[in-house]
Regions:
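Extracytosolic ligand-binding ectodomains
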Residues: 4-10, 19-370
Length: 370
């Protein structure tokens, strides 16, 4: 509790130091340390770029936008305290919160923002628990993580049909376990439950070498790795040391760049799943070209941080107001402009979740295979 209290005091001082002007504020709640620091930095880069664009063009509805970056510590009690601290700031309007990145105490966090009438956008795909939370000013911009399971199965069925698949997850991480269950459910739906099996890191007390041996002795020829970046890179290395030809799939954002440093040449041949292919996306082409010409290159999740701000900007322009109720009302419009084309939203989520692309990594290059 002492640690939580000290964190809240530091957060309060950080927020108040940013509250010296009459502008409106956009807050990003994303990790600044530990396993998810890369994801946080990427989101920060995209959000800041979008805000800078708005301000350089004269602001929004006559106001400049201030940016406040808040650490998401991926902790249940701190997640709620962070939301409460942002909600009580009256000196300067916090009109939008992007995040949090982690799903800790998600329903409570969303409640806090809804009661404070602060619009909230989740810039990444959400899991089953988050999907159940519905608020009129809560946007799940990309839809649901079970889309990853659907796209994985489609590629598996066309390329590796018949291979036995190990899904290896972190039993202490609710999000990882929900993603694992989505994969199992997708195979069951298609009558292929016999070829997929769930393993968790704790069944061998996090002895990755023993788990790699068990997985392959069970006859599995490929694995989908879930969990923290540390879980993923350690498991991948042990699987490849046991058998260099073992097929590995994982989520590119979850694995992050530490994967390549840790595995070296053993990383070759890994399949990475990433939200929607960029190269052949006509809706994004104009935006990407414009930004590249200005010297800005998207990295990882930066595109989704940028897109969250632009989505909110479009809703504010439609509403001609920053007010929560007026902005929220336009989520029911038939066509909402996003960086991915016009979308229809239902209960704050797009009617069709963003799909995933699959890339095979080889010799420091990504080759799109799906």
């Amino acid at each position: 509790m002492r640690y939580v209290f000290l964190y809240i005091i530091c957060l309060f001082l950080t927020i108040n130091s940013a509250l010296a002007t009459p502008n409106v504020t956009v807050a990003l709640v994303a990790p600044k340390a530990e396993e998810y620091i890369q994801q946080g930095e990427e989101l920060n880069k995209g959000v800041k770029r979008a805000i800078d664009e708005i301000n350089n063009e004269g602001g929004l509805l006559g106001k400049k936008i201030d940016f406040l970056a808040v650490d998401d510590q991926c902790n249940d009690s701190i997640a709620v305290s962070t939301a409460q601290m942002l909600a009580v700031q009256k000196e300067k309007q916090i009109v939008l919160v992007i995040g949090p990145y982690c799903a800790n105490s998600f329903d409570q966090v969303a409640d806090v923002y809804a009661h404070a009438k602060i619009f909230q956008i989740i810039p990444t795909a959400v899991n089953y628990t988050q999907a159940k939370t519905i608020k009129k000013g809560l946007v799940k911009m990309l839809g649901y993580t079970n889309q990853e399971a659907k796209d994985f199965f489609n590629y598996y069925n066309s390329t590796f049909a018949g291979n036995k698949v190990a899904v290896i997850s972190n039993s202490n991480d609710a999000e990882s376990m929900e993603e694992a269950q989505a994969l199992i459910n997708e195979f069951q739906k298609h009558g292929k439950s016999v070829v997929i099996k769930l393993y968790t890191y704790d069944i061998t007390n996090k002895d990755y070498e023993a788990l790699a041996e068990l997985v392959q002795k069970d006859g599995n020829e490929m694995a989908f790795l879930l969990g923290t970046a540390k879980n993923i890179r350690k498991m991948a290395r042990r699987l490849r040391e046991y058998n260099e030809k073992f097929i590995i799939f994982t989520n590119k954002y979850a694995a992050n760049n530490s994967y390549f440093d840790y595995l070296g040449s053993l990383a070759d041949g890994t399949y990475f799943m990433e939200l929607r292919g960029r190269n052949d996306d006509p809706e994004l082409a104009e935006t990407l070209v414009k930004l590249r010409l200005s010297g800005f290159e998207f990295e990882g999740l930066s595109l989704y941080g940028y897109s969250a701000v632009k989505l909110w900007e479009n809703l504010v322009k439609k509403a001609k107001s920053f007010e929560y109720d007026k902005v929220s009302a336009h989520l029911n419009d038939k066509n909402i402009k996003t960086e991915f084309g016009n979308k229809m939203f239902h209960n704050g989520a797009p009617k069709v979740s963003e799909s995933y692309a699959i890339y095979r990594y080889e010799d420091e290059n990504y080759v799109k295979v799906y």
